[in-house]
Regions:
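Metal-dependent nuclease catalytic regions and adjoining charged, substrate-binding loops involved
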Residues: 11, 179-283
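Short beta-strand or tight-loop elements
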Residues: 13, 114-120, 131-136, 249
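Nuclease catalytic cores
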Residues: 17-37, 41-62, 95, 99, ...
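Active-site-adjacent bridging/hinge elements
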Residues: 24-32, 147-154, 226-227
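Glycine- and acidic
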Residues: 36-39, 155-162, 283
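Hydrophobic (often cysteine-bearing) scaffold residues that line and stabilize catalytic clefts
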Residues: 44, 48, 94, 169-172, ...
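A non-catalytic, helix-rich entry segment at domain boundaries
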Residues: 54-119, 125
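Mg2+/Mn2+-dependent nuclease catalytic core
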Residues: 120-220
């Protein structure tokens, strides 16, 4: 880069930054290697999560008069992703569970209240990064004093119980809130995790200072990614690749899509079965 030239912004998503934090080697395989190593089989819990997200997004696109619990269940059935399950019978059991989840969840929503966005892409820029990402749902609400406020809603279908700390510490949710506030010129500090299996909502109200800290954290992570990307693109010997993109072996390696291409990950944890991430799994 020539002296005096503006620094190129690093384009990223919260998912990309999180991938770097989790494991630099997996980050390289996901975003830089071309072609990437072959992935393992699809995960049933990801199929279930995508099916639920798609059904809820479709529900909001229905005419208001048709936004009912059974309609959400029908959308779930129509868009069911039957991948990663041990058998058709197991898939059917979880499809029925998922149908009940979306019917129960949508029964508690006001169909007349239009979200500001559904599966909405938001983005923002700083002096260092150009960040973008997609929000499950962006609500427009009124505070007690009548002030217009926005809230970021993220659907969760995993078996792990959640707390407000999960909402508080989530870097993606904080970045989505900051980006949405800037895009819509409104206050957006509230982030919510809607855990459909338990029917619970776990929320956090950020301060401006808290959002600024999360943005600074994202910029620092992005700087590490950008430096590693440049070194990779310039060409690295095999030893250099591992030095810049080291593995982080641990129990999570059993869930990694690239476990078969990673000796350290393969040694760190046994491969999980594609349906092991489902609640109460038994084929």
């Amino acid at each position: 880069m020539l002296a005096g030239m503006p620094q190129r912004l690093y384009a990223c998503t919260p998912t990309r930054l999180a991938s770097w934090l989790d494991c630099p080697r997996r980050y390289r395989m996901s975003y830089l290697d071309r072609p990437p190593p072959p992935k393992g089989p699809p995960w049933a819990h990801n199929s279930l999560g995508a099916s639920v997200h798609n059904a809820l997004a479709g529900w909001w696109r229905l005419p208001r008069a048709r936004r009912t619990g059974p309609a959400a269940g029908d959308l779930l059935d129509q868009g069911w992703i039957n991948q990663g399950y041990a058998s058709d019978a197991q898939s059917e059991r979880y499809r029925e569970d998922a149908r009940q989840m979306v019917e129960r969840y949508t029964a508690g929503l006001d169909p007349a209240t239009e979200p500001l966005g559904v599966e909405r892409t938001v983005g923002t820029r700083t002096e260092r990064i150009a960040m973008s990402g997609r929000i499950d749902r962006l609500d427009e609400r009124r505070a007690a004093d009548g002030t217009r406020e926005l809230a970021v809603v993220d659907y969760k279908t995993g078996r792990r119980p959640l707390t407000s700390d999960d909402a508080r510490t989530s870097l993606p949710l904080a970045l989505y809130a900051l980006a949405a506030g800037r895009m819509f010129h409104a206050i957006c500090r509230r982030v919510e995790l809607h855990h459909l299996p338990s029917g619970t909502v776990h929320a956090w109200q950020h301060s401006d200072q808290g959002l600024a800290r999360q943005l600074g954290r994202a910029e620092d992570i992005a700087a590490e990614c950008a430096d590693a990307d440049r070194k990779f693109q310039a060409g690295l010997p095999p030893a250099g690749v591992d030095a810049v993109f080291p593995p982080r072996p641990g129990p999570a390696c059993g869930w990694c899509d690239y476990r078969a291409a990673c000796p350290e990950g393969s040694a760190a944890a046994a491969a999980r079965l594609p349906w092991d991430g489902l609640a109460g799994t038994e084929p």
